Amino acid sequence: MQKILIFLLLVLSDILSKYFVFNFIDLYQFIKITNFFDITHIHNFGVSFGLFSGTIPSLVLILIGLLVTAFVMYLYINSNDTLERWGLFIIICGAIANIVDRSINGYV
């Protein structure tokens, strides 16, 4: 039960943070947080760093995201290392939030 609550909290915080960026930061505008960390409002229609943007249909990217998430879940289930499991758990939460975003908006 506690894991489900943490899962929901992480996924919702990911989605809410994107909501605030979308509604309060203009497209392509950035906010400097620290010397090495900025928040930038951008729409990613591709994969990592916008690769293949516009060349792969959104539905295909959603299906690939689901397959990769399933593989990471497999790794999570079969891991005996606590730290590794937490890392995989966080990756799964972010991946699911991205799948939700891409399903609703067509981009991440």
Where are these regions (language model features)?
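Alpha-helical transmembrane bundles and membrane-interface segments of multipass inner-membrane proteins
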Residues: 1-108
